[in-house]
Curated annotation (Swiss-Prot):
Protein's name in the database: Urease accessory protein UreF
GO molecular function, one term: nickel cation binding
Main subcellular location: cytoplasm
Locations listed in the record: Cytoplasm
InterPro entries: UreF, UreF_sf
Subunit structure of this chain's protein: UreD, UreF and UreG form a complex that acts as a GTP-hydrolysis-dependent molecular chaperone, activating the urease apoprotein by helping to assemble the nickel containing metallocenter of UreC. The UreE protein probably delivers the nickel.
PANTHER family the UniProt entry points to: UREASE ACCESSORY PROTEIN F (PTHR33620:SF1)
Keyword Manganese attached: no
Function: Required for maturation of urease via the functional incorporation of the urease nickel metallocenter.
Family stated for the protein in its record: Belongs to the UreF family.
Entry's Gene Ontology cellular component terms: cytoplasm
Keywords, comma-separated and alphabetical: Chaperone, Cytoplasm, Nickel insertion
């Protein structure tokens, strides 16, 4: 075990990392308003679906970006970044991934001083890169020596915790309920990592009509606790 790498992973996977994730519910708020999610069981199902969709789309791009960065192919990371952005069909998803991505890059370059992260932030500021959160995470953690599968674990954990943290504020669930759901979903992390490694960037799939419908409903909702 590399203790330094492990603690870096823990730091940047922390659900309270100041990148703005708390402002978004990843579709949960609309799902609750639409009566799709209404109890612990449906919350668990909703989160699992989000994890499956994330790993077959963003996860494959993260894996490909990490592999490209480890071989010095920085331009490929930019291409994978736009591949993610272009597959976000709704305004809410695009806003979430780019806002969080830029915040992560800004924070990480100040904290770590890594030249690769500084280069990435410059690409974002000059609009050469979209600066999506998944690829920014790949850049940051590759600069810190994390393996591609470790970055996928971080990405999947972030997806789950964005939804489950929002659930605490939106539903009558306890912290124990949330941890029980998370513990159960984490049993499949090896399968999620294997899925991310399948096919490469050309096999990204972003078909998630319910997510897009919920995002559209959220933008026009009369009351909202979370950002769009």
């Amino acid at each position: 075990m590399n203790a330094l790498r492990l603690i870096r992973i823990m730091q940047f996977a922390d659900s309270v990392l100041p990148v703005g994730a708390f402002s978004f519910s990843n579709g949960l708020e609309s799902a609750i308003q639409s009566k799709i999610v209404y109890d612990v069981a449906t919350l668990s199902d909703f989160t699992r679906t989000a994890l499956l969709q994330a790993v077959s789309s963003d996860g494959r791009a993260v894996m490909a970006a990490c592999q490209a960065l480890n071989s010095g192919q920085h331009d490929a990371a930019i291409s994978h970044d736009w591949a993610i952005f272009n597959r976000k069909l709704n305004e809410e998803s695009r806003t979430m991934v780019t806002r969080m991505g830029k915040k992560l890059a800004e924070m990480a370059v100040e904290v770590t001083g890594e030249s690769l992260i500084a280069w990435w932030l410059a690409q974002i500021k000059s609009d050469i890169a979209a600066g999506t959160y998944p690829i920014t995470l790949a850049v940051v953690m590759s600069a810190l020596g994390a393996a591609p599968r470790e970055v996928i674990v971080m990405h999947q954990y972030g997806v789950a915790m964005t939804i489950l943290s929002a659930a605490i504020r939106l539903m009558r669930v306890t912290h124990i309920d949330i941890q029980r759901i998370l513990f159960s979903l984490n049993q499949d992390i090896e399968l999620f990592c294997d899925e991310a490694e399948k096919g490469g960037i050309e096999q990204m799939t972003s078909y998630a009509p319910m997510t897009d419908v919920l995002a559209a409903l959220h933008v026009s909702a009369f009351t909202r606790l979370f950002s769009n």
